[in-house]
């Protein structure tokens, strides 16, 4: 429930105690203190001094409790003439609509901001007119004028146009109030509203202390301290007279209070009230001195609490800035957990196989164990206290004037700014339309750089895939799903293009060549996407060459990254890891297909070489069925079933050839589920290749799984 002021029910226990003690002390002063000071003159003087102070304390307390310290931009919630629920729903609806427009097209940012600005101006004008009409009607009511003295906010220096413009640019959006608030506003959990320049929530007032009532609060503390000092001083004087002038006091007690009241009860009542006043002076005086230091340093109680909490959680001898830097590398820091693997920031980890996600706790790598229980990725099971499953609650920060005197106000302001930036309730007004995931994962990376990075990564993957397709058009072997050699040696093939380190390498790209050096020979590019079940979703490209297939000049800045692939070695009688040709070798092979011969050191079966004049026709000729079966099936001893895959024919393949290849694919698909097994060779430390086997009547699997 949103609380408008401190007098709104339910009342806090400390508020009731404060009001009760004030009333008892005032009654005790007029009944037991002033009449027994000594003479009528002293009595009238003390009453004349005490009464204004007590009235001032009463007025200031009522005023400080009755003032609504809420942010000016949410004051319409407390207007009785407006339906608060409807306004909140309208704000939420506008917030969602504007957010959806921003997500749909970045080009509408300026237009939506202009519309939002016009609507906010219109709403502010309507609110001002409504408040003015209400104030005019209340001017004719004397009781309303009297109450206005207690509820009007403090007179503070008005902000100039430059400051107002700066506050509007640095405004925040409260997700609980569904409204834009000022930069230094904070949402109070007790009052359930955003308080302008939040200082603290006072339980004795049952109200928040902010910009609108801070002057009244300081004045209340000063007046209360003076009132308690007068109360305690007069009480001490009365107690002294009770024990010094016994006969005189007995006569005065009988004259003022009657025969039923003696000297002992008077001493007890005066002594109790005096003790309460004295004991109340010390914490109140400390609080007033504490706020004097806050005013001198130019910070608020909230900033002091945030700074002290950061210093208490920091290691010994570390400042607030060093503690925050350590938090950035902790598992709970949003700056560390928000970075994605596809960013261009160079993550300090490489692709892993089947290990849990790595977490960096104070720059030390922590790998959680794979326990049966559910363990969050940001929690170290080996850390002490992790068995509780929840983080210990933050200890309350005690008020210490000595620590405040030594505190640097700049550090306190920076700590408060970081606390506001990391708040899940208050969001920057420029980013309030972004989804929560974007806000937590982008971090300090700008949106423009993220978009450009994603575009570079996509272009890099397309270029690498095209290079591999061009090289595989002359080779009947396809790269495997991955090998452990790639991970150990750091080389990356087609299988680990999505690893973080590989993505980082492929982010920096040179611009694509505009004028190719050789345009005489054009090749038909074939793009195919095959799943593990060999479905028939085959995509063919046209005869025209794609711009990504054009040959780059000799001064191209594209890096020739070494890639590996699993191929069959007839001499060794097993599959081995061999480097895939680089982009320059692919260009030479495509330009001079007749010069390519089988290597004796690393024999790799390739398509028969043809001259350049008949190269395109050779590509269009389909392979006979018996040759396809021979190439797809290995009949010797092997640790795997089957052999490499057959290449997908080009678009110009005749209909009869496509039918033969389709039959081969259907037979391969029926064999995969029957004979495919996933095992690992402990001798060669080689990962399995997911390739079909057992094709044909004469094929022999004959492999012994180790």
Curated annotation (Swiss-Prot):
Q: What is its EC number?
A: 2.3.1.225
How does the record say this protein sits in the membrane?
Multi-pass membrane protein
Which reaction is the catalytic activity of this chain? L-cysteinyl-[protein] + hexadecanoyl-CoA = S-hexadecanoyl-L-cysteinyl-[protein] + CoA
Q: Which domain of life is it from?
A: Eukaryota
Q: Where is this region: Disordered?
A: 470-505, 591-621, 680-706
Catalytic center at which residues?
202
Q: Which residues form the DHHC domain?
A: 172-222
Q: Does the keyword Transferase feature in the UniProt annotation? A: yes
Entry's transmembrane regions: 16-36, 41-61, 220-240, 275-295
Which ranges form a coiled coil? Answer: none
Q: Name one GO molecular function term.
A: protein-cysteine S-palmitoyltransferase activity
Per UniProt, the keywords (alphabetical) are: Acyltransferase, Cell membrane, Cytoplasmic vesicle, Lipoprotein, Membrane, Palmitate, Transferase, Transmembrane, Transmembrane helix
| PANTHER family given in the database record | PROTEIN S-ACYLTRANSFERASE 20-RELATED, ZINC FINGER DHHC DOMAIN CONTAINING PROTEIN
What is the protein's given name?
Probable protein S-acyltransferase 20
Q: What is the lineage of its organism?
A: Eukaryota, Viridiplantae, Streptophyta, Embryophyta, Tracheophyta
Gene designation: PAT20
């Amino acid at each position: 429930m949103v609380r408008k002021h401190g007098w709104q029910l339910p009342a806090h226990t400390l508020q009731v105690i404060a009001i009760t003690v004030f009333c008892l002390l005032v009654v005790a002063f007029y009944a037991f203190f002033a009449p027994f000071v000594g003479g009528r003159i002293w009595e009238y003087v003390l009453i004349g001094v005490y009464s204004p102070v007590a009235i001032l304390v009463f007025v200031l307390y009522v005023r400080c409790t009755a003032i609504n310290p809420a942010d000016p931009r949410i004051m319409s919630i407390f207007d009785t003439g407006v339906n608060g629920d409807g306004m909140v729903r309208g704000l939420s609806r506008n917030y969602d609509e504007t957010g959806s427009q921003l997500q749909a097209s970045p080009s509408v940012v300026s237009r939506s901001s202009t519309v939002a600005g016009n609507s906010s101006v219109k709403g502010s004008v309507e609110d001002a007119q409504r408040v003015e009409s209400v104030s005019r009607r209340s001017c004719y009511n004397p009781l309303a004028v009297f109450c206005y003295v207690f509820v009007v906010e403090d007179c503070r220096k008005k902000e100039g146009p430059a400051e107002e413009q700066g506050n509007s640019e640095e405004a925040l959006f409260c997700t609980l109030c569904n409204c834009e608030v000022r930069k230094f506003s904070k949402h109070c959990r007790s009052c359930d509203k955003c308080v302008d320049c939040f200082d603290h929530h006072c339980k004795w007032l049952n109200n928040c202390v902010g910009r609108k009532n801070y002057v009244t609060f300081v004045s209340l503390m000063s007046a209360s301290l003076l009132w308690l000092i007068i109360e305690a001083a007069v009480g001490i004087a009365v107690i002294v007279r009770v024990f010094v002038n016994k006969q005189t006091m007995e006569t005065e007690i009988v004259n003022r209070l009657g025969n039923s009241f003696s000297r002992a009860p008077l001493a007890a009542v005066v002594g109790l009230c005096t003790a309460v006043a004295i004991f109340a002076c010390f914490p109140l005086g400390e609080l007033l001195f504490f706020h004097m230091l806050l005013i001198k340093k130019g910070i608020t109680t909230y900033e002091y609490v945030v700074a002290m909490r950061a210093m208490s959680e920091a290691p010994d001898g570390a400042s607030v800035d060093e503690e925050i830097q350590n938090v950035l590398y902790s598992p709970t820091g949003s700056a560390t957990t928000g970075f994605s693997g596809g960013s261009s920031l160079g993550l300090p980890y490489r692709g892993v196989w089947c290990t849990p996600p790595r977490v960096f706790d104070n720059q030390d790598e922590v790998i959680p164990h794979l326990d049966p229980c559910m363990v969050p990725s940001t929690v170290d099971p080996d850390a002490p206290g992790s068995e509780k499953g929840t983080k210990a609650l933050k200890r309350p920060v005690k008020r210490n004037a000595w620590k405040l005197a030594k505190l640097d106000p700049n550090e306190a302001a920076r700590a408060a700014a970081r606390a506001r930036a990391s708040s899940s309730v208050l969001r920057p007004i420029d980013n309030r339309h972004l989804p929560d995931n974007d806000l937590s994962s982008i971090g300090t990376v700008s949106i423009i750089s993220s978009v450009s990075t994603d575009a570079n990564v996509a272009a890099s993957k397309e270029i690498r895939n095209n290079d591999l397709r061009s090289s595989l058009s002359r080779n009947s072997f396809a790269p495997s799903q991955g090998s452990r050699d790639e991970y150990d040696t750091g080389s990356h093939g087609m299988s680990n293009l999505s690893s973080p380190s590989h993505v980082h390498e492929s982010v920096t790209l040179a611009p694509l060549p505009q004028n190719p050096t050789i345009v005489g020979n054009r090749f038909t590019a074939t793009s195919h996407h095959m799943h593990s079940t060999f479905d028939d979703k085959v995509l063919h490209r046209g005869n025209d060459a794609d711009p990504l297939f054009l040959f780059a000049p000799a001064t191209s800045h594209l890096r020739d990254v070494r890639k590996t692939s699993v191929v069959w070695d007839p001499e060794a009688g097993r599959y081995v890891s061999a480097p895939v040709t680089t982009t320059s070798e692919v260009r030479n092979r495509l330009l001079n297909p007749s010069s390519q011969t089988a290597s004796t050191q690393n024999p790799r079966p390739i398509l028969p070489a043809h001259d350049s004049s008949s190269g395109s026709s050779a590509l269009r000729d389909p392979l006979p069925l018996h040759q396809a079966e021979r190439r797809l099936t290995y009949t010797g001893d092997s640790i795997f079933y089957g052999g490499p895959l057959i290449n997908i024919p080009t678009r110009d393949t005749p209909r009869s050839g496509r039918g033969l290849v389709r039959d081969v694919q259907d037979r391969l698909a029926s064999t995969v589920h029957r004979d495919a097994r996933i095992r690992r060779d402990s001798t060669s430390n080689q990962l399995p290749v997911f390739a079909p086997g057992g094709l044909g009547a004469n094929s022999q699997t004959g492999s012994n799984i180790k």
